[in-house]
Amino acid sequence: MATQTVDDSSKSGPRRTVVGDLLKPLNSEYGKVAPGWGTTPLMGVAMSLFAIFLCIILEIYNSSILLDGISSN
């Protein structure tokens, strides 16, 4: 016969670690959504500032903005 049965007593459960015990409270809120907008406006502000930063970097790269004393190849 090609199949083999294994006793449940020989299997061990998941191993507990210190890191796992520290991170478990973070996972306890999984799937729960706070009512309302929450931190959405803050994320919008952060994304806007990051987009402005990327535009400035792009303009410097394209030499649209010239910086005194800095030459680009």
From Swiss-Prot:
<dbReference type="Pfam" id="PF00737">
    <property type="entry name" value="PsbH"/>
</dbReference>
<keyword id="KW-0602">Photosynthesis</keyword>
<keyword id="KW-0604">Photosystem II</keyword>
<dbReference type="GO" id="GO:0015979">
    <property type="term" value="P:photosynthesis"/>
</dbReference>
<keyword id="KW-0472">Membrane</keyword>
<keyword id="KW-1133">Transmembrane helix</keyword>
<keyword id="KW-0812">Transmembrane</keyword>
<dbReference type="GO" id="GO:0009535">
    <property type="term" value="C:chloroplast thylakoid membrane"/>
</dbReference>
<dbReference type="InterPro" id="IPR036863">
    <property type="entry name" value="PSII_PsbH_sf"/>
</dbReference>
<comment type="function">
    <text>One of the components of the core complex of photosystem II (PSII), required for its stability and/or assembly. PSII is a light-driven water:plastoquinone oxidoreductase that uses light energy to abstract electrons from H(2)O, generating O(2) and a proton gradient subsequently used for ATP formation. It consists of a core antenna complex that captures photons, and an electron transfer chain that converts photonic excitation into a charge separation.</text>
</comment>
<dbReference type="InterPro" id="IPR001056">
    <property type="entry name" value="PSII_PsbH"/>
</dbReference>
<keyword id="KW-0150">Chloroplast</keyword>
<protein>
    <recommendedName>
        <fullName>Photosystem II reaction center protein H</fullName>
    </recommendedName>
</protein>
<feature type="transmembrane region" description="Helical">
    <location>
        <begin position="41"/>
        <end position="61"/>
    </location>
</feature>
<comment type="similarity">
    <text>Belongs to the PsbH family.</text>
</comment>
<keyword id="KW-0597">Phosphoprotein</keyword>
<keyword id="KW-0934">Plastid</keyword>
<comment type="subunit">
    <text>PSII is composed of 1 copy each of membrane proteins PsbA, PsbB, PsbC, PsbD, PsbE, PsbF, PsbH, PsbI, PsbJ, PsbK, PsbL, PsbM, PsbT, PsbX, PsbY, PsbZ, Psb30/Ycf12, at least 3 peripheral proteins of the oxygen-evolving complex and a large number of cofactors. It forms dimeric complexes.</text>
</comment>
<dbReference type="GO" id="GO:0042301">
    <property type="term" value="F:phosphate ion binding"/>
</dbReference>
<keyword id="KW-0793">Thylakoid</keyword>
<dbReference type="GO" id="GO:0009523">
    <property type="term" value="C:photosystem II"/>
</dbReference>
<dbReference type="GO" id="GO:0050821">
    <property type="term" value="P:protein stabilization"/>
</dbReference>
<feature type="modified residue" description="Phosphothreonine">
    <location>
        <position position="5"/>
    </location>
</feature>
<feature type="modified residue" description="Phosphothreonine">
    <location>
        <position position="3"/>
    </location>
</feature>
